[in-house]
Amino acid sequence: MSSKEQKMPDEQVSEDMEVVSEQQNSADKAEASETESVVDPRVAELEEQLKQAQQRERDAILRAKAEVENIRRRTEQDVEKAHKFALERFANELLPVIDNLERALEVADRTNTEIAPMVEGIELTLKSFLGAVGKFGIEVVGDTNVPFNPEIHQAMTMMESDQHEPNHVMMVMQKGYTLNGRLLRPAMVAVSK
């Protein structure tokens, strides 16, 4: 036998194997396409569920970040308020001292030359004291001829007046004070009708 004749059956076998392999591949492809069409709705459903879960997670992360930012902002505001109004209790204790210095000046006999240095000392002390508390944000509320404001004034009486417009402060009986814009004590006033 020649070598040519021996190759023939081997070639035949390899060709047969290729044909069988191609048939198997096409059968696998057909089966895969059938499987894809069967699995496709389920895969689509799972992909949709995955997208929804990812969106929920993104939303949860955004909400958590926003909440952290809100907490940080509130904490900063609380700290700022604590710094700003830490003196409130102390300032309330100082108000009677200011009132007493003002009353001392009101009743002092300014015509008596013997007590003139004392009156001048009280005036300077009051001025210095008001300057010192003013540096810390304490301001006086007690102007006359201004519109009555219930947020900073406490009306003690209402009086008829031709010299003042209606609902204006005519007289201040006791001055009020604010600390950085927050009312410490309202001004006690007489209001025109």
Curated annotation (Swiss-Prot):
Record family assignment: Belongs to the GrpE family.
Function as written in the Swiss-Prot or TrEMBL entry: Participates actively in the response to hyperosmotic and heat shock by preventing the aggregation of stress-denatured proteins, in association with DnaK and GrpE. It is the nucleotide exchange factor for DnaK and may function as a thermosensor. Unfolded proteins bind initially to DnaJ; upon interaction with the DnaJ-bound protein, DnaK hydrolyzes its bound ATP, resulting in the formation of a stable complex. GrpE releases ADP from DnaK; ATP binding to DnaK triggers the release of the substrate protein, thus completing the reaction cycle.
GO cellular component: cytosol
Protein name: Protein GrpE
Subunit structure: Homodimer.
SUPFAM superfamilies for the chain: Coiled-coil domain of nucleotide exchange factor GrpE, Head domain of nucleotide exchange factor GrpE
Main location: cytoplasm
One Gene Ontology term of the molecular function aspect: adenyl-nucleotide exchange factor activity
Stored Pfam families: GrpE
PROSITE patterns reported in the protein's UniProt record: GRPE
Biased composition, class Basic and acidic residues, residue ranges: 1-10
UniProt KW Chaperone keyword: yes
Gene that this polypeptide is encoded by: grpE
Renumbered residue ranges of the record's region Disordered: 1-45
InterPro entries: GrpE, GrpE_coiled_coil, GrpE_head
Matches recorded under PANTHER family: GRPE PROTEIN, GRPE PROTEIN HOMOLOG, MITOCHONDRIAL
Localization per record: Cytoplasm
GO term, biological process aspect, one: protein folding
Keywords: Chaperone, Cytoplasm, Stress response
Chain ranges passing through the membrane: none
